[in-house]
Swiss-Prot record:
Encoding gene (name): midn
Biased composition (Polar residues): 1-12, 286-295
Sequence ranges of Pro residues compositional bias: 220-231, 376-386
Compositionally biased tracts (Low complexity): 176-190, 261-285, 387-400
Keyword Cytoplasm set for record: yes
Full protein name: Midnolin
Start-end of Basic residues biased regions: 196-209
Single GO cellular component term: nucleus
Annotated function: Facilitates ubiquitin-independent proteasomal degradation of polycomb protein CBX4. Plays a role in inhibiting the activity of glucokinase GCK and both glucose-induced and basal insulin secretion.
PROSITE patterns attached to this UniProt entry: UBIQUITIN_2 (PS50053)
Primary localisation category: nucleus
């Protein structure tokens, strides 16, 4: 049973003689005939399955394997080994592309687009991306829009399983998206691109040697928050809050980086969350002089550390996190599989729900309204909730008691980069805006109904001819007064009163 995976891996890399010596079974050749006229020959191991055959065809034809249907003697191949299905060397298979239409293909498109993009990657592309040798470019389809994403991890140091993520830029027109899901929670439209600028990285790392990676353009991105610290981890290259201690302790299977040189690490009284003032990724358990935050294990996942809106639809940022244990091998290294890439993408999409950064203009407006309101105290910045960190590291390390008293508006503007609005406050603001829109729409609808009623009543026939002109004059005056948008317009409807007056006058006559 151990010979089959080796035979498959060898044949996929092109070392056919070594495969025959290991497996002892010669590969079989299959003739693939497509209904569109394409014919080619495919060599694969004798123990190959239908799923593996579809994967090979998908990589060769650049077509998602879900859209491939294979027929052998008028029998559709769905699962199982090829030998068990009567397929031998020289067999002829018919390839029928699957065509989907209507709403059925729309339902599962977002999930399938990611898997289709990942399954079309070769083993070399996956290995080069996870080792940091080359970037990874994916073409994803979100709804009716195409999005091109390019990711790159730092070169993996010798002996260390750390993956260090670089810069994330997504281009496309998005309405209130969080990158990919402000971007996952909004819809990115048009073209999206994620590019990463490589940064210098130490080729070798010692457990007790401080390793600091400096960004090539530190001002391009806001400083980063804390980084999860269970191995292996993919961390950002943006600058952090505190520098590494002289001798950082070694965590199991991973080495931790800090991204900003010479910055004091002290807990901030304005931030109850330890992650906001001092990242534990650069503080060790043995050195307590600079940081008194206890080192604890963290859950797998990702955190978006910075998010910058460069232009409409063009976003950049950094995120970091730790891989799930299922994506690690026995030595703690990341598995060279598309499942690892899928886990990183899922962590990024999940992190967008916790990220609350927005373009500076919107944030500035919201904080100006919050700081000028009498209910919110201006001198102290609001506390940072879990998974949210300040956008500048140095001001948060200064105790709030030592800060001079400033004008509330000045303090508000200085706090824009120190804290992020809590989720409850954001939801309240959004709910208030939604209610205002609904009330405005209701008012407009009521106004239209009143106009229609006025026009309808003005054209209604009357049973008395002598005063018909007077009735029309009253209706015209009412229509002119309707433009003032009185809410008691119903009280001033003329028809019942006019009819009563008319009847009384008619009787008196």
């Amino acid at each position: 049973m151990d010979q089959h995976p080796s035979a498959r891996s060898c044949s996929s890399r092109g070392a056919a003689p070594s495969c025959e010596s290991v497996s002892g079974e010669p590969p079989m050749n299959l003739y693939i005939h497509s209904t569109t006229g394409t014919r080619f020959e495919l060599s694969l191991p004798a123990e190959e399955t239908v799923e593996g055959l579809k994967r090979r065809l998908s990589q060769r034809l650049k077509v998602p394997k879900e859209r491939l249907a294979l027929l052998h003697k008028e029998t559709r191949l769905s699962s199982g080994k090829l030998q068990d299905l009567g397929i031998t060397d020289g067999s002829k298979l018919t390839l029928v592309p699957t065509v989907e239409a209507g709403l059925m293909s729309q339902a599962s498109r977002p999930e399938q687009s990611v898997m289709q993009a990942l399954e079309s990657l070769t083993e070399t592309q996956v290995s080069d991306f996870l080792s940091g040798r080359s970037p990874l470019t994916l073409a994803l389809r979100v709804g009716d829009h195409m999005m091109f994403v390019q990711l790159q991890l730092a070169a993996q140091p010798s002996g260390g399983p750390q993956l260090q993520h670089r810069h994330l830029i997504s281009r496309g027109s998005s309405e209130g998206t969080t990158g990919l899901s402000h971007g996952a929670s909004g819809s990115a439209s048009g073209m999206a691109r994620v590019s990463h600028n490589p940064h210098p990285h130490h080729p070798h790392q010692h457990p007790h040697h401080p390793n600091t990676t400096l960004p090539s353009n530190p001002a391009a991105f806001p400083p980063s928050p804390s980084i999860p610290s269970i191995p292996p981890m993919y961390s950002t290259s943006a600058s952090g809050h505190c520098s590494p201690p002289p001798q950082p302790s070694q965590l199991p299977g991973s080495f931790l980086h800090s991204q900003q040189p010479s910055s004091a690490c002290a807990p901030s009284p304005s931030s109850p969350s330890p992650a906001a003032s001092c990242p534990e990724a650069s503080c060790s358990a043995k050195t307590s002089g600079n940081c008194n935050t206890p080192l604890r294990s963290r859950k797998p996942g990702a955190i978006i550390e910075s998010f910058v809106n460069h232009a409409p639809g063009v976003f950049s940022g950094t995120f970091s996190g730790t891989l799930h244990p299922n994506c690690q091998d026995s030595t703690g290294r990341p598995r060279r599989d598309i499942g690892t890439i899928l886990q990183i993408l899922n962590d990024l999409l999940s992190a967008t729900r916790h990220y609350q950064g927005m373009p500076p203009s919107l944030t500035q407006l919201r904080y100006q309204t919050q700081c000028t309101s009498p209910n919110s105290p201006a001198p102290s910045p609001p506390p940072s909730p879990p998974h949210t960190t300040g956008l500048t590291g140095l001001p948060t390390t200064v105790p709030s008691e030592t800060q001079p008293t400033l004008h509330p508006l000045v303090q508000c503007q200085s706090q824009i980069r120190m804290c992020k609005p809590p989720g409850d406050r954001l939801r309240q603001t959004e709910n208030r805006a939604t209610r205002c829109k609904v009330e405005r729409l209701q008012l407009l609808m009521q106004q239209k109904r009143l106009r229609r009623k006025a026009r309808r009543d003005s054209r209604a026939p009357y049973h008395w001819l002598p005063n018909r002109k007077a009735g029309r004059s009253n209706s015209n005056s009412s229509m002119s007064s309707e433009g003032s948008l009185d809410l008691d317009f119903e009280d001033s409807v003329w028809k019942p009163d006019v009819k009563a007056d008319m009847k009384s006058e008619f009787i008196m006559a």
